Design a protein with these regions (language model features):
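PLP-dependent amino-acid enzyme catalytic core
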Residues: 1-161
């Protein structure tokens, strides 16, 4: 691989689409932000005291896709995470999860009861927006919630994102 060629993830592109829209009010197409994304891949010391030109292109973007773009941006920023969580089949478990696991600024963005696996437990697909998945995971463990984080390499990930 040529060191001058930069690989840009879909999530990074989505992040920059959101940034240019929110910060500058510019609606670009995904290909239009590639030059901005590439700048993030170049060490800052190589850019110092140089004139840099980025070509931005197109408003050829369907605004109805912005919720999907926003989600991919949050994934890129490591602020959105998906889990399969085993909830005990007894009263007040969701309340326990909300009060003991979630922080003040954490948010449940998806909650799907998958199925009761037995009389004692049921699996739930949970999407969380959080600034620290590590803290969430530690709190889930501390509160005896069994869970599996859904990773990009998991087959179900492409279904969710």
């Amino acid at each position: 691989q040529n060191e001058n060629i930069k690989l840009i993830s879909n999530e990074h592109i989505c992040h920059e689409l959101i940034n240019t829209y929110q910060d500058d009010g510019i609606i670009l197409e995904p290909a239009g932000v590639l030059s901005i994304c590439a700048l993030d891949k170049i060490p800052q010391e190589h850019l110092k005291n140089k004139n840099i030109v980025c070509i931005l292109s197109g408003g050829n973007n369907d605004v109805s896709r912005y919720p999907e773009i926003m989600e991919k941006s949050l994934l890129y920023l490591n602020k959105k995470h998906y889990y399969i969580i085993e909830f005990p089949q007894k009263p007040k478990q969701l309340k326990k999860f909300i009060f003991n696991v979630l922080g003040e600024n954490d948010d449940i963005t998806r909650f799907e009861y998958i199925k009761k696996t037995n009389k004692s437990f049921g699996n739930v697909l949970v999407g969380l927006e959080t600034s620290s998945s590590e803290i969430i995971e530690n709190k889930m463990s501390d509160n005896n919630f069994k869970f599996k984080k859904i990773l990009e390499s998991d087959l179900i990930y492409s279904y969710l994102v």
